[in-house]
Amino acid sequence: MEFAQQRDAVIVEDFFDQIYHDLTPFWGLQPAKIRRQAKNFDFVISIRNGSTTVKSDDTDRPWMALWNNLTATVAEWLPDIDIPINVMDESRVVVPWEDINEYVKVERATRKLVAQPEVVTEYSGLRELDEDPGEPFDPEWIKDGLYWDIARVGCSPDSPSRDIEALTNFSGPPPMPSGFPARSFKGYVANWTEAKDPCLQPDLRGSHGTFVEPISLSTTHYLFPLFGGSKLPLNNEILLPPAMYWTTDEFYSGGEEHGGAWETKNTGVIWRGVASGGRNKLENWTRFQRHRFVSMVNGTAVQLAEKNSNGVGPNFELLSYNTYHLTATQYMDLGTWLNGISEAAFVNLVCFPETGNEHCPYTDSYFEVKKVMRMRKQYAYKFLPDIDGNSFSGRYRGFLRSTSLPIKATIYSEWHDSRLIPWLHFVPMDNSFVDIYGILDYFVGTGIAEQQGGEEKPSVQGAHDEQAKKIADAGKEWAEQVLRREDMQIYVMRLLLEYARVCDEKRERLGFIDDLR
């Protein structure tokens, strides 16, 4: 607590719920087993006597270096521990729901309030483990198959996705809502937790690259401690603040220039990125989320779909104008409107197999490749959509800290989720993206300023610019209080103290009671 007070931290107990969600199942494993699993993993950050060391391969692993740097800043206050690290983009641990349920039952049965005289306040240490690390363990990595079928065992038996098999044909547009997205309120995200959960949305198996064809596949159904920067809600990794949030590299952080005043910004959408999300190929690229989003906010692509294909594009399908009742489409067609307010493009089409350049023979005719735009230049626009890549998007924290408004769609969980409130700190978006038009219509309106009778200055029909600014300002102000580097340090310190407790033979009696003495 002293560490947090010295850094002027906002401490709300709910901010740390993710720690206990992640660690609870490990009470179902013997501490000695957890310690040996952690010690013998291939990629490990170890703390001994307040200093950190890294075990890795010879490959350059920038994430390992960044996480080690973060851990080292708080290591002097931590006990000896081994922290296994997931160096891949993709989540790697998904334990069957039934197994996790049994592990949680053990935690509930064994954790009790302990009388003060019985509390142990010192960790046991790892001297015996260092002297005898034991044999390497085999997580039994699954490296073949369809990830949807591998992952859905992590869904509860009564969830919509549990018994739905993976798709094998990914030609044509993905499954799209025929009306308002499920679990929405009048077409807009009402429950952010549900909106991100693949267990509740079987259609994601055919519309998100994670389930179509991830970049790499190395997953286990075996519970062991593995730390990473993001995970699906059904995965069992232990979340750290992502390494890209700790870096000062302006490519991800946007630097300390967070954009100018709202009134000086371009009233429109900007998005730049690579065509990541998995291995997009000739036979499946139409099912990838970034390709779909770029197409759906491209005025020309939308005009072609409207005029030539009854609203159906190669990788999306438009809803009827009568669904969201947009103000803009009362004055012009959807494509024309988008041409005036949206600017989204890839900087690399990332072919599989690779072409050796930024182009791709099977998507070149659909997408224009543009130059990289640094985040500081993107901050000149009011609206910043953020879309999953191979996993989470590393730009989200930078967007939240900017004076622009983040519009977020994701299926990934991060360390800070309980700190951020949708519609207060950011605008949530459904992973089908069918609500993007309604979102922009509400905030931007027609995009055309006209002088109305009795008004001092031109106004935009249907626009709610002040409401957009209010959310952007609230998100920035809150991020500057709870998403600082200091807040990441505090989270990691508490996480690793609790993790060390789970690894300790005396864990049921281990506790902090100095405040009671």
Where are these regions (language model features)?
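Secretory-pathway glycan-assembly enzymes, especially type II membrane glycosyltransferases
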Residues: M1-R374, R509-L516
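Catalytic binding pocket for nucleotide-activated donors in carbohydrate/polymer assembly enzymes
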Residues: V372-L516
